A protein has these predicted regions:
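Conserved acidic, metal-coordinating active-site core of Asp-based
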Residues: 117-220, 226
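Non-catalytic pre-domain segments flanking phosphatase-related domains
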Residues: 1-15, 63
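Active-site phosphate-binding/coordination module
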Residues: 29-127, 243
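Mg2+-dependent phosphoryl-transfer enzymes with acidic/Ser/Thr/Gly-rich catalytic loops
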Residues: 3-9, 29, 189-281
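Conserved ATPase-coupling elements of RecA-like P-loop NTPase cores
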Residues: 24-28
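Phosphate- and divalent-cation-binding pockets in alpha/beta enzyme and binding domains
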Residues: 31, 56-59, 135, 201, ...
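Residue-level detector of anion-binding/catalytic polar loops
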Residues: 45, 182, 237-238
Length: 281
């Protein structure tokens, strides 16, 4: 995809990946090919907003020929390809081939806090930084190569509790909040982070695009669960896709009663909804 700043795109599309654009079981996006091709034809920026690391996203972006900025590790940072915007990106630091705007604390601080909080409340936790690639693969179901990419973190630390009671887990969460940190759960794994949210990163990017294009842009976001609430709350049109069983996350519906409900889970629903957006529905 070419740089959108020189194209007459009317939309910005922000998308979660696993369970949204990507099939939750196979990680395939084949059911969304029609919409992806239409996005490219129109020159619409497609910005991935995900819990994945920069290393993981670089591979996926190459496969999808995506040259746009992306948001990693639950809003920890924005990575903007060098030369993408013809303006100064305030607060950005050079990281490899990108300008990086960081919202989260450095990874070393987060892992140190994980160990300190665990010791404080007497919780037995195991973080990614304490596991090698083989152990991460065994605990997550990822392949060895995928596990190595997931291990290359900048902001957010996945971890699990080893036999902790609900009371100890609650104490851990409260102790983390006392330190100004966030604890979220995604399946078996929990995530410790600080100072960031997906919506904050999305808002920052929307402002950059509008400064560059200087025309009306409609921001659209797609997600499927509570962890995407911040993302969905930050755009003009929020789209909630159903869970694999066809149900919608009631916690999102209660907070965003006017959210657009997608017609099907995963890439099938993603495809249909994006095409409807372009038709003005």
């Amino acid at each position: 995809m070419g740089l959108p700043v020189v194209l007459p795109a009317r939309h910005l599309i922000f998308s979660d990946l696993e369970g949204t654009l990507l099939d939750p079981h196979t990680s395939s996006w084949s059911a969304a090919e029609e919409a992806l091709q239409e996005i490219e034809r129109r020159g619409v920026p497609l910005i991935f907003v995900t819990s994945k690391t920069r290393a993981e996203l670089e591979i996926l972006r190459r496969k999808l020929s995506n040259a746009h900025p992306f948001v990693t590790e639950r809003g920890g940072g924005i990575f903007i390809p060098e030369g993408y915007f013809n303006l100064h990106v305030e607060g950005a630091q050079r990281v490899a081939r990108y300008h990086c705007v960081s919202f989260g604390r450095p990874y070393a601080e987060v892992t140190a806090a994980l160990e300190a909080i665990a010791a404080e409340v007497g919780a037995d936790v195991v973080g990614f930084h304490q596991m090698n690639t083989r152990e991460i693969a065994q605990n997550t179901g990822l392949g060895r190569r995928q596990a190595e990419l997931a291990r290359q973190r900048d902001f957010d630390e996945p971890f699990f509790f080893a036999g902790a009671s609900e009371s100890v887990i609650n104490k851990f969460v409260q102790a983390a909040r006392h330190r100004g940190m966030e604890v979220t759960q995604a399946g078996r794994f929990w995530h410790l982070s600080a100072g960031h949210a997906e919506g904050r990163a999305v808002t920052y990017l929307v402002k950059l695009y509008r400064r560059t294009v200087r025309s009306r842009l409609r921001s659209v976001a797609l997600g499927h669960g509570l962890n995407h609430l911040s993302l969905l709350s930050a755009v003009d049109q929020a789209i909630l896709l159903p869970q694999p069983d066809g149900s919608f996350d009631s916690r999102v519906l209660s907070r965003l009663p006017h959210v657009t409900r997608g017609p099907a889970p995963g890439p099938t629903g993603w495809n249909q909804t994006v095409l409807q957006v372009f038709k003005g529905r």
